[in-house]
Amino acid sequence: MADKKKITASLIYAVSVAAIGSLQFGYNTGVINAPEKIIQAFYNRTLSQRSGETISPELLTSLWSLSVAIFSVGGMIGSFSVSLFFNRFGRRNSMLLVNVLAFAGGALMALSKIAKAVEMLIIGRFIIGLFCGLCTGFVPMYISEVSPTSLRGAFGTLNQLGIVVGILVAQIFGLEGIMGTEALWPLLLGFTIVPAVLQCVALLFCPESPRFLLINKMEEEKAQTVLQKLRGTQDVSQDISEMKEESAKMSQEKKATVLELFRSPNYRQPIIISITLQLSQQLSGINAVFYYSTGIFERAGITQPVYATIGAGVVNTVFTVVSLFLVERAGRRTLHLVGLGGMAVCAAVMTIALALKEKWIRYISIVATFGFVALFEIGPGPIPWFIVAELFSQGPRPAAMAVAGCSNWTSNFLVGMLFPYAEKLCGPYVFLIFLVFLLIFFIFTYFKVPETKGRTFEDISRGFEEQVETSSPSSPPIEKNPMVEMNSIEPDKEVA
């Protein structure tokens, strides 16, 4: 089988370098939590010296909330701007260019203490948010386009692995014994410059996406050379043939704008699936679990809950690796269903444990917490990011990634803003809200989400088109082909 290529050093190198962008996203998501009190003291001291008056607790809380939330605002804008870069500059060059934002944001945050400027830190967080928003679109798309069909899901999971490793590194670096101190917190925030430098240098030796070269730039010879290097074989005729077929189809289609994704019947179902899967990630309650984890561990008698939280981060990382090996065996749809269903059970257990407050059940709540995190990384964590790239052909893919990424960042922002109020109103029963969401997303996934394992981009797109033709009253009914049956739990056989 032509798709059963060996895993080459060039392929591993390309996807690993791209995943540094995901690591940046994870690091900058988690880095702000540990030094919260130290940075608030910096805000208080700096603004008091500047105004000559004591800063009110309300203003301090508002400034801190802004510092946290502005990252997501930047992410929303950045993720929605993905399509402006990818077709103009290419996949690799886009990742290279946006590291300028990482340098600027990291420098502003690192120098904010010396400059005694609270504004620098907040603006730096916004710029880093822009950068991370762009990365959440660039990385999964690049990885999906350089990977062979049979390994696309496994390598796509590296995007989520980069995110969770970044969060774990931020948690560890944020410990008081490392960089979570009054003297070193600017370095903790500015450390994001280091992986940016590494990625800039490494990207110079990465190939451009062969799909971009052939389909967008019409440079078949370059695409063939890149494919031969990535696949470790001279015979890449099947890949070239599949790309040419997709290119021919793309030339007959209207330009895929964001509005066209919702107007066109062929794109409407995949974009709704893409948005819903992104919402299933953010509305699953994973952020609430991390919010509650310290309290859960404290009630269980753990004297250093911060280390238990890091333990949850380790579980996060380990089960992302597990997902990497499972996704090409079990399939995307199955793992997403297992993750959502298992998380719903864990959410119910955590609700009971938090409500009863019995000593014996505290330890069950810890198991449920770790189980919730593990199941998140089996399905809802990694799959929504890379399945979007699989559901669309080359033309609409950048616009689809922009819409999906923006919906993820927007829901992340809303959960962050609204969760404290929901927690105050519902107390330990707040997880029931997420339980309802998990069940809704489980039902949606079961009935609407296709299995994409082992299928080419063109085959998946054709499946949606045939569904539209089947459901259209003006079109005669067509016989469903197992290769394009969109709601089948069983994955299709790999393309020979």
Curated annotation (Swiss-Prot):
It is a multi-pass membrane protein. Its main location: membrane. Keywords: Cell membrane, Cell projection, Glycoprotein, Membrane, Sugar transport, Transmembrane, Transmembrane helix, Transport. Glycans are attached at residue 44. It is found in: Cell membrane; Perikaryon; Cell projection. Residues 464-496 are annotated as: Disordered. Residues 1-11, 87-91, 144-154, 206-270, 327-332, 389-398, 450-496 are cytoplasmic. It comes from the Eukaryota. GO terms for molecular function: D-glucose binding; D-glucose transmembrane transporter activity; galactose transmembrane transporter activity. One of its GO terms (biological process) is D-glucose import. D-glucose binds at residues 160, 281-282, 287, 316, 377, 385. Deoxyglucose transport is inhibited by D-glucose, D-galactose and maltose. Galactose transport is inhibited by D-glucose and maltose. The chain crosses the membrane at residues 12-33, 66-86, 92-112, 120-143, 155-175, 185-205, 271-291, 306-326, 333-353, 363-388, 399-419, 429-449. One of its GO terms (cellular component) is plasma membrane. It holds the Pfam family Sugar_tr. CDD domains: MFS_GLUT_Class1 (cd17431). Residues 34-65, 113-119, 176-184, 292-305, 354-362, 420-428 are extracellular. Residues 278-280 are annotated as: Important for selectivity against fructose. Belongs to the major facilitator superfamily. Sugar transporter (TC 2.A.1.1) family. Glucose transporter subfamily. Transport is mediated via a series of conformation changes, switching between a conformation where the substrate-binding cavity is accessible from the outside, and a another conformation where it is accessible from the cytoplasm. This is Solute carrier family 2, facilitated glucose transporter member 3. It comes from Gallus gallus. The gene is SLC2A3.
